[in-house]
């Protein structure tokens, strides 16, 4: 369904074209990821994220060099009950390979979760409608205090009436009125898939196995600290070589990885947040699919039309109005207006089409 948006022609920054769950993904989550990335980056490269216990012969810049090397290269965790350090092969398997890359991974996750938003904006342009402009100008009209007796407003409302040629295309004898709904479902499916992919990537990236957020949370609730579990260890070891007078000396330093204290809290919270987003996103998809039911369509539009002051509303008429004029695209567009404004703005959006429909019926 293609609706004439000439009445809502003033362009503003698009912010009113998504529902609450979309905004949780595309705005709040992106802000959470980017702000966390900047915080961790500042802690790593501006503050002191690692301190190593160096021997006495490390004088001058040696200790600083060792700490910089251990920060850039991987450190590894050894349980304090182990009296000896493991062999080289075992050390490599115990390396912590994530802490240097945390800021970049967070930035990457922010980009990934914003991809459906970019696609949604592109699809709106492709189908020829800007929902943000529709909703925003409805809000402006509501805030301006205009009444229905104002001839200018009546003129503008007539301009936005949904005519048959403007609301649908005929393809092989059938009206095409589900393009907007298809785009909505496609972006929501994509967003949900990307959330699960991001959770799987975090499980792999942290090297703590699947469902690491649940596992670490259970450990914390049971009083099992990082010294026992090895999750996000604060004390690690680092190996490096120093060439002195033609000899290569191997050193193993014990280091305090302070940034892991923040990483633990951040990635546990992030895992649970993504789990919540996954549940909400699945619910969101089923909510859109539920709008295909005739009962919901009639109930929803009847509630919207009740705000127009029309007392003569029958379920049969509303059903015909939905089938012939709004169809599923109109239903979903009205839902988006309602989600970003109020029921009264949604009623202002539907009223001209309803009045035109009743005139045609008579």
UniProtKB/Swiss-Prot annotation:
GO biological process per UniProt: monoatomic ion transmembrane transport
GO cellular component term, pick one: gap junction
Transmembrane spans: 27-47, 101-121, 189-209, 266-286
Subcellular location: Cell membrane; Cell junction, Gap junction
Record flagged with keyword Cell membrane: yes
GO molecular function per UniProt: gap junction channel activity; gap junction hemi-channel activity
Major location (coarse): membrane
Signal peptide (UniProt feature, chain positions): none
InterPro entries hit by this protein: Innexin
Membrane topology: Multi-pass membrane protein
This protein's UniProt keywords: Cell junction, Cell membrane, Gap junction, Ion channel, Ion transport, Membrane, Transmembrane, Transmembrane helix, Transport
Record-linked PANTHER family: INNEXIN (PTHR11893), INNEXIN-17 (PTHR11893:SF27)
Its biological purpose: Structural component of the gap junctions.
Protein family according to the UniProt entry: Belongs to the pannexin family.
Name of the protein this chain belongs to: Innexin-17
Species of origin: Caenorhabditis elegans
Taxonomy of the source species: Eukaryota, Metazoa, Ecdysozoa, Nematoda, Chromadorea
